[in-house]
Amino acid sequence: MTQSQQSHRKDEHVFLAEKYFQSVAHAGFDQVRLLHRALPETTMAAVDLKPDLPFNWQWPIYINAMTGGSPQTGKLNAQLGQLAQALGVAIASGSQSVALRDPQLVPTFATLRDHDPNGFILANVGAGHHATAAEAAVAMLKANALEIHLNAAQEVIMPEGDRDFMWQANIKSIIATSQVPIVVKEVGNGFIREDLQSLQQLGVQFVDVGGRGGTNFATIENARRSGHDFAYLQDWGQTTVESLLEARGLGLAMLATGGVRSPLDVVKALRLGAHAVGMSGLVLHHLIQTGYEATLAYFQNFLHQLRQLYALLGVTNWQELQEAPIVLSADLEHYRQARGLPGI
């Protein structure tokens, strides 16, 4: 694939992600009910939102992987880096595979660090890459951590996608040699417990469930196919909420992404065991539709509302939130029982 073809594909992904963005997502958060406390017995001043992670993050949300690899997406990354710095949140790069193949594309990713010089940045490579490529991706961004993304469904549907999914040896090798923490993530199809246990056996400690319900790469890649012949996979995978249930009790540090649309979605994900919650589509949508300044104001208010919701629930930190009363829908409870998953 030529540089122009690679760049065009990256631009297509951004265009289609926005085209198919849904303001009401289907990630399962509507099936989770947090119960109102008439006597919260707390104050907003007492709330500590700092996540229970060894990353020194100040907030339980972060900007998750999106883009890079073309002049247009490089400009988006510059804005995203600037936004992360202004909000004081971590940010993950889009897949750096194209820049590892073509050094001329490195600036479209490195602009993240240029605009967020002191922030926490996660580099990003696919699980098909070896340890040397992972090290190069980290160096490219002077990254604080590395995401390894799992995207089998996307690759299957992508006309020019990979067809080799022998990934576990690569993941194990990257973990063994990495100088930074590793987060293994799905890109929109979620996890089942068996695969999470396999990752644990490889030495993985941090997992982003990347559940179904948000940016849908099955739909995006199918739209790029001339025959649109994979439409039946648009609902493939486990939702973000189902994936969090699959992860409960394993001892992994879970991050939750996929279909997060509101501060309440964030709090629900945290209550289900996520240590932090990432957003991609919502951030991209606001940047494209409203511009940088309005997006910054929106997410500043978003962070403030997280504090308000904690106080409303009568909790002051993540540990206390784990005891907040919660009810699952009948369908979600049936899923939990059918899969033999721990209770909440």
From Swiss-Prot:
Binding site for FMN: 65-67, 95, 124, 185, 215, 259-261, 280-281
Gene Ontology BP term (one): isoprenoid biosynthetic process
Any one GO cellular component localisation term in the record: cytoplasm
List of residues binding substrate: 9-10, 154
Principal subcellular localisation of the protein: cytoplasm
Claim: Cell wall biogenesis/degradation is one of the keywords in the record: no
Domain of life per record: Bacteria
Cofactors required: FMN; NADPH; Mg(2+)
UniProt catalytic activity: isopentenyl diphosphate = dimethylallyl diphosphate
E.C. numbers: 5.3.3.2
Residues the entry annotates as binding Mg(2+): 155
General function of this protein: Involved in the biosynthesis of isoprenoids. Catalyzes the 1,3-allylic rearrangement of the homoallylic substrate isopentenyl (IPP) to its allylic isomer, dimethylallyl diphosphate (DMAPP).
Subunit structure: Homooctamer. Dimer of tetramers.
Protein family: Belongs to the IPP isomerase type 2 family.
Protein name (Swiss-Prot/TrEMBL): Isopentenyl-diphosphate delta-isomerase
Gene that produces this protein: fni
